C-alpha cells in the first residue's frame, strides 16, 4: 500500500513538472515570437556584416536617414548619452499586418565599442531618465553587452531615442585602452518588406509571376485578392495571391507583363545607418593639459606684470 502511494506521488510530481515546463515554454515562446528585433537576433550572430552593412537592411528595403549624437570625449566609468534620431513625417500612416492603416513605429540597434555597455539604473541621473522615458533596452546577445537594441516603439513619441551608456575603465578592464573608437547605429521607421524566410509582408509591392491576360480578380472574404493570369506562353492559369491592405493597379481583362507591379507601393518607412566617433580620454592627460594651460596663463600674466614694471623703471629714469 505504501509502495503504491509512493508511485502515485512520483507520478503526480512528474505530471506537475511537465505541466509547469510546458507553461513556461509557451509563455517564453509567446514573448520571444512577439519580441523585436527577434528576426535579426535569431538569424545573425552579429548585426553588422563584414562589409559594414547592418542586417536590418535585409528586411527594410527603403533607404532613409538616421543620425546619432554622442560626446566627442568621455572619461572612464562615466555615464553619457547616445541620442539616435529617426526622422520622418508624423502625418504618414503605414499598412498594418491586418490590412488597416496605423501609425509608424521605430526601432534602433546601437553597436558600441567593446567594453561600453548599457548604464545600470542606479548610475542614470533623473534628467537622463526623463529623456529615456519608458523605453526598455536589451542586449543583442547575452554575451554582447556592447550591442543594444530597442523597438518597436511609437514613432510619434520616440523619434529620438536616448541610450544611457556606461564608459569602461581601462584600470579594471585590460582589454580597453584610451583611444578613439567608432560607434555604429541603425534605425528604422515602419514595418519591413521581407521576412527572414524570404517571404513578403503586406508592406511592399507585389509583381506578376507570369505575363498574359488577367482572367479573374477574386476579392477574398477576409481581405486581399486572388488574381488569375492566363500565361501567354503556354495558356496555363497562374494565381497570384495579394494580401490585404494593398491597392490594385490592374483590372480584369488587362494584358500584363512578367514582373509588372500588380499593386502600388504602400511602404512609407525605411531603414538607415550611420556612425560616429568617441574618444575615451585619460583623466591624467586632461589634468596635464589643464596644468599646461594654467602654466601658460600664469606665464603670460607674469610677462605683462614684468613689462609694466620695466616700463615704470624706464619712465622713472627718464624723469630723473
Swiss-Prot record:
Keywords: Chloroplast, Electron transport, Heme, Iron, Membrane, Metal-binding, Photosynthesis, Plastid, Signal, Thylakoid, Transmembrane, Transmembrane helix, Transport. It is a single-pass membrane protein. Residues 1-35 form the signal peptide. Heme binds at residues 36, 56, 59-60. One of its GO terms (molecular function) is mRNA binding. It comes from the Eukaryota. Its main location: plastid. Binds 1 heme group covalently. GO terms for biological process: photosynthetic electron transport chain. The chain crosses the membrane at residues 286-305. Its cofactor is heme. GO terms for cellular component: chloroplast; chloroplast thylakoid; chloroplast thylakoid membrane; cytochrome b6f complex; plastid; thylakoid. It is found in: Plastid, Chloroplast thylakoid membrane. The keyword Transcription regulation does not apply. It holds the Pfam family Apocytochr_F_C. The 4 large subunits of the cytochrome b6-f complex are cytochrome b6, subunit IV (17 kDa polypeptide, petD), cytochrome f and the Rieske protein, while the 4 small subunits are PetG, PetL, PetM and PetN. The complex functions as a dimer. Component of the cytochrome b6-f complex, which mediates electron transfer between photosystem II (PSII) and photosystem I (PSI), cyclic electron flow around PSI, and state transitions. Belongs to the cytochrome f family. This is Cytochrome f.
Amino acid at each position: 500500500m505504501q509502495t503504491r502511494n509512493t508511485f502515485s506521488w512520483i507520478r503526480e510530481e512528474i505530471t506537475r513538472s511537465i505541466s509547469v515546463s510546458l507553461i513556461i515554454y509557451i509563455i517564453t515562446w509567446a514573448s520571444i515570437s512577439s519580441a523585436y528585433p527577434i528576426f535579426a537576433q535569431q538569424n545573425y550572430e552579429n548585426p553588422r556584416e563584414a562589409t559594414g552593412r547592418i542586417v536590418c537592411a535585409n528586411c527594410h528595403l527603403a533607404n532613409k536617414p538616421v543620425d546619432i549624437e554622442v560626446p566627442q570625449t568621455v572619461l572612464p566609468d562615466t555615464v553619457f548619452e547616445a541620442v539616435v534620431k529617426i526622422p520622418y513625417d508624423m502625418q504618414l500612416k503605414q499598412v498594418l499586418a491586418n490590412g488597416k492603416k496605423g501609425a509608424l513605429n521605430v526601432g534602433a540597434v546601437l553597436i558600441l565599442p567593446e567594453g561600453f555597455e548599457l548604464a545600470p539604473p542606479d548610475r542614470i541621473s533623473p534628467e537622463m531618465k526623463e529623456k529615456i522615458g519608458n523605453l526598455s533596452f536589451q542586449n543583442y546577445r547575452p554575451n554582447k553587452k556592447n550591442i543594444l537594441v530597442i523597438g518597436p516603439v511609437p514613432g510619434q513619441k520616440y523619434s529620438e531615442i536616448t541610450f544611457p551608456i556606461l564608459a569602461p575603465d581601462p584600470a579594471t578592464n585590460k582589454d580597453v585602452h584610451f583611444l578613439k573608437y567608432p560607434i555604429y547605429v541603425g534605425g528604422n521607421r515602419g514595418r519591413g518588406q521581407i521576412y527572414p524566410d524570404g517571404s513578403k509582408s503586406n508592406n511592399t509591392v507585389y509583381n506578376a509571376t507570369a505575363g498574359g491576360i488577367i482572367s479573374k480578380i477574386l476579392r477574398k472574404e477576409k481581405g486581399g485578392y486572388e488574381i488569375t493570369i492566363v500565361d501567354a506562353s503556354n495558356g496555363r492559369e497562374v494565381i497570384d495571391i495579394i494580401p490585404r491592405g494593398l491597392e490594385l493597379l490592374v483590372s480584369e481583362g488587362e494584358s500584363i507583363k512578367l514582373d509588372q507591379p500588380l499593386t502600388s507601393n504602400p511602404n512609407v518607412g525605411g531603414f538607415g545607418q550611420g556612425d560616429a566617433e568617441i574618444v575615451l580620454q585619460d583623466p591624467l592627460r586632461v589634468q596635464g593639459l589643464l596644468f599646461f594651460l594654467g602654466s601658460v596663463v600664469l606665464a603670460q600674466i607674469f610677462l605683462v606684470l614684468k613689462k609694466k614694471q620695466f616700463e615704470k623703471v624706464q619712465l622713472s629714469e627718464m624723469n630723473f
